[in-house]
C-alpha cells in the first residue's frame, strides 16, 4: 500500500493505519516531511528513505533543484535509515551520476527516479537479511555509512523570489538557475512577465557541450579562458541578437545567454 498524507504529524489516523499493516519496513521517497518517532519505531526492519542527492550535500526538500542551481557536476541517490533529523540518517547504498550542462530539473528527476527504484530493489533484500533487533545492532550488521557534518548543505524550499532572473549575474549562473527551476524561472520584457524554459550559456570553453547553433554563437558572444569581459554596449538583460529559428541572445555580466524557449 502507498500512503501520501498531506500532514503526517497532524493526521492521527495515519499512525494507526500504518500499524495495522504489520509491515516489516517503511520506504519513503520524495515525501518532504519528517516522520514522527511513533511511526519511525513501528516497523521491525526500520524506515528507509530514497534521497535524491549524495548526502550530506543537499539535505532537505529541493536537492535536485539546488544541485543544478549551484552547478554541481555530479549528484546521485542514497538509501538511508530515517531518523528524527532532516535527512541525517546513515546511508546504506549510494550511486553517483554526472549532471549534463543542458539538463533541467525535470530530466534529472526522471533519471534519479529510475536510479532510486534500482537502488531500493538492491537495498531491501539486504535490509531483510540483516533482520530485526535494536536499531544500532541492525545498522551495524548492514555496514551503513554514518553521515559527516562536514560538507553538509541544506536544500531549502524555493520561493517566488528565487524564480526571478538577475541578468547582471554570469551566463552560467543564469543558465543554471533556468535549468534548476524548470519550468519556473521568470523575467520581464516591456512590462510582460515571461517564463524561461530553455537556455544555453554562450561560453567558449563549453562549446563542446552546447548545441551546434549555440557553439557558433559562443564564438561571437562568449569569452575565451582568462579573457576579461569587454564593456557591453548594451546593459545586462538587453537583447544582443535575434537568431531566426534558434532564439534570442541576451547580455549578462560577461558572456551572453541564448534563450531558446
Regions found by a protein language model. Name each.
Residues 162-261:
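An anion-binding loop in the catalytic cleft
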Residues 1-183, 244, 254-261:
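One-carbon transfer enzymes
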Amino acid at each position: 500500500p502507498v500512503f501520501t498524507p498531506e500532514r503526517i504529524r497532524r493526521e492521527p489516523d495515519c499512525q494507526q493505519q500504518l500499524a495495522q499493516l504489520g509491515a516489516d519496513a517503511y520506504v519513503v521517497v520524495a515525501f518532504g516531511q519528517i516522520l514522527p518517532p511513533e511511526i519511525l519505531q513501528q516497523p521491525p526492519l526500520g524506515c528507509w528513505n530514497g534521497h535524491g542527492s549524495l548526502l550530506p550535500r543537499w539535505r532537505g526538500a529541493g536537492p535536485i533543484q539546488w544541485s543544478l542551481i549551484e552547478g554541481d557536476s555530479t549528484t546521485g541517490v542514497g538509501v538511508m535509515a530515517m531518523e528524527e533529523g532532516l535527512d541525517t540518517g546513515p546511508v546504506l547504498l549510494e550511486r553517483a551520476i554526472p549532471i549534463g550542462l543542458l539538463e533541467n530539473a525535470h530530466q534529472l528527476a526522471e533519471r534519479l527516479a529510475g536510479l532510486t527504484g534500482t537502488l531500493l530493489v538492491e537495498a531491501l533484500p539486504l535490509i531483510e537479511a540483516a533482520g530485526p533487533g535494536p536499531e544500532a545492532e541492525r545498522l551495524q550488521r548492514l555496514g551503513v555509512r554514518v553521515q559527516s557534518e562536514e560538507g553538509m548543505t541544506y536544500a531549502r524550499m524555493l520561493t517566488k523570489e528565487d524564480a526571478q532572473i538577475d541578468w547582471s549575474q554570469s551566463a552560467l549562473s543564469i543558465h543554471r538557475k533556468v535549468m534548476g527551476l524548470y519550468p519556473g524561472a521568470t523575467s520581464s520584457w516591456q512590462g510582460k512577465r515571461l517564463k524561461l524554459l530553455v537556455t544555453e550559456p554562450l561560453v567558449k570553453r563549453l562549446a563542446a557541450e552546447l548545441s551546434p547553433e549555440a557553439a557558433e554563437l559562443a564564438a561571437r558572444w562568449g569569452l575565451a579562458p582568462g579573457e576579461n569581459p569587454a564593456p557591453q554596449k548594451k546593459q545586462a538583460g538587453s537583447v544582443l541578437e535575434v537568431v531566426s529559428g534558434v532564439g534570442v541572445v541576451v547580455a549578462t555580466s560577461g558572456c551572453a545567454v541564448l534563450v531558446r524557449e
